[in-house]
Design a protein with these regions (language model features):
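Hydrophobic residues at beta-strand termini and immediately following loops
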Residues: 61, 84, 150, 177, ...
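CN hydrolase (nitrilase-like) catalytic-core segments centered on the catalytic cysteine
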Residues: 13-33, 100-183
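Short secondary-structure transition/capping motifs
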Residues: 10-14, 40
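Short beta-strand-to-loop element that shapes/binds the nucleotide-sugar donor at the catalytic cleft/hinge
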Residues: 34-39
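Exposed aromatic-hydrophobic patches
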Residues: 184-190
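Active-site catalytic loop in hydrolytic enzyme cores
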Residues: 40-111, 124-137, 161, 190-208
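Short, conserved active-site loops that position catalytic residues or coordinate cofactors/metal ions
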Residues: 1-11, 118-120
Length: 208
């Protein structure tokens, strides 16, 4: 979520902005997909940085479809989609509007994707119609693989108070979450590559 009390900065491998996230991943032995502004070789990107469970930086996806709005016109578009083997699951990653285009699902399917993670700031309605229709299209075009949408909430920067996080499979929405900032947990069979949950397990951040 955007923080009005924090100055906007771009992460890089040369500064320490990712350090606290890397330390948390190491401490809890969890992988993190972190939506953030990122700068590499003096080129700013709207990215999803991937941090490994041992606390090291792994890789990143740079958003390919940069919209010409004030919220994003600072970023240069990425050029490619990659699929990484993460804990035995071939995983594709996208940022927000990347998920709108069926051909992007086809690109990760061609590379053997079994799961997709999308970090987003995508309120309901707006440009391009309901976001869930784009997410369904993405899942279908990627051979029906499970898609996890991690969406922004809150009202800072823009109104995402009704934005939904979601899990999809075979081109259909399985379940969603809408509300305050929370930790959302699902049960996933990493061998059969199946979503076992029928709803999110929700932990409100105020309860932590």
């Amino acid at each position: 979520m955007m923080r009005s009390d924090k100055q906007f900065q771009l992460a890089s491998l040369q500064n320490n902005l990712l350090q606290e996230f890397m330390e948390a991943c190491r401490q809890y032995k969890q992988r993190l997909f972190l939506g953030c502004g990122f700068v590499d070789e003096k080129t700013p990107r709207n990215s999803c940085a991937i941090i490994s469970p041992d606390g090291t930086y792994y890789n990143r996806h740079d958003k390919t479809k940069v919209v010409p709005w004030i919220t994003e016109n600072w970023a240069h578009p990425g050029e490619k989609f990659e699929v990484w083997n993460l804990e035995g699951i071939n995983t594709g990653v996208m940022v927000c509007a990347d998920a709108y285009f069926a051909e992007h699902g086809e690109k990760i399917a061609e590379q053997g994707a079994e799961f997709a993670v999308v970090v987003a700031a995508w309120p309901p309605g707006g440009h391009g119609g309901p976001p869930e229709e784009a997410w369904k299209r993405l899942s279908r075009s990627a051979n029906g693989i499970p898609v996890l949408i991690c969406n922004q909430t809150g009202t800072e920067g823009m109104d995402c108070s009704h934005a939904q996080s979601a899990v999809l499979c075979n081109g259909e929405v399985l379940f969603t979450y809408e509300g305050r900032e929370a930790v959302l947990i699902i049960d996933f069979d990493e061998v059969k590559k199946l979503v076992l949950s029928t709803e999110f397990v929700t932990i409100n951040l105020t309860d932590i």
